[in-house]
Amino acid sequence: MNVAVIGAGRMGADHVRRLHESINNATVAAVVDIDLDRAKAATEGTGALAVASLAEAFAVEGVNAVLIATPGFLHEEALYQALQRDVPILCEKPMTPDAASAWRVVQAEVALGRQRIQVGFMRQFDAGYQSLKSEIEAGAAGSLLMLHCANRNASTLADFTEPMLINDSVVHEFDAIRFFTGEEITSVQVQVQVQVQVQVQVQRGKRSSLAPEGISDPQHVLIETESGILADVEIFVNARYGYEVATQAVFENGVRSIGAGEVTPSFIERFAAAYDAEVQAWVDAALHGEIGGPSAWDGYATAACCEAGVAAQRSGQRTAVVLAAKPELYR
């Protein structure tokens, strides 16, 4: 499989290296970036061509798959171009920045008549996540009742905004909760330290003195699924000590924890093996005309969760997740 990697930033360059060094049955044929110098730097030692547009990449002989790793607001148009050529697509999260654009992408894929888009929620490929998923499905400890999640990051960049706690971080918990439970999320509530009128009930958490000006950090997110499973997420993006993601599953007859104490400098180190497994699964499935992980529907559903999460963050109130009817293609 000859892959065009779109975007030569941190994630794109990492995927170029991964495809070149670690993935079987795939090669990097082209790297696309509007900054040609950055694209050329990413191609060094791979034999791939550096180009400035996806149209140029498709003109490269043999290109028959696309990996999208640009900023999220650029994903939609790239997805349409790739769908028009009916090639396998691995799109980093978010699939698109909002539910409306994500639904348009779903409709475009439905019109194509088969699934071509795999969305890059890499945690599903982590060994710990897969082990916990297997235990939930086996049911040896009874039904899953609750999930307690923590998502901690060492620090944020200067341009970080409060909605990014949801859109960039809790988005992974939205996906993980859907992955573990096999259910859609129905509501989200975010509890922060805010000034509110008495009639609005918001639990006020203590704000870290190290949080950037204007951002309440950490925050607490309460999530409910279709069958009533409750999940809570501690999101703390300026924890300073490192990157740590942990999940505790509460069953009728037992408790299982993953991730606690696995502290790394960033998500890249923590989920390096998961990224490798994700891309290999995509390649293996694509060679058989299939996808090997989260679908465009999953990308749409998590976008809807994020919209509800940001609305709940602003209001402090329980907010419903609104989803369109699930197309037959994804059932």
Curated annotation (Swiss-Prot):
Gene3D superfamilies attached to this UniProt entry: Dihydrodipicolinate Reductase, domain 2 (3.30.360.10), NAD(P)-binding Rossmann-like Domain (3.40.50.720)
InterPro entries for this protein: Gfo-Idh-MocA_inositol_DH, Gfo/Idh/MocA-like_OxRdtase_C, Gfo/Idh/MocA-like_OxRdtase_N, GFO_IDH_MocA-like_dom, MI/DCI_dehydrogenase, NAD(P)-bd_dom_sf
Keyword set includes NAD: yes
Single GO biological process annotation from the record: inositol catabolic process
GO terms of molecular function: inositol 2-dehydrogenase (NAD+) activity; nucleotide binding
A Pfam entry, by short name: GFO_IDH_MocA_C3
Enzyme class: oxidoreductase
EC number: 1.1.1.18
Alphabetically ordered keywords of this record: NAD, Oxidoreductase
Catalyzed chemical reaction(s): myo-inositol + NAD(+) = scyllo-inosose + NADH + H(+)
PANTHER family given in the database record: INOSITOL 2-DEHYDROGENASE, PTHR43593
Description of how the protein assembles with itself and partners: Homotetramer.
Function: Involved in the oxidation of myo-inositol (MI) to 2-keto-myo-inositol (2KMI or 2-inosose).
Family the UniProt entry places it in: Belongs to the Gfo/Idh/MocA family.
HAMAP family: IolG
Protein name per its UniProtKB record: Inositol 2-dehydrogenase
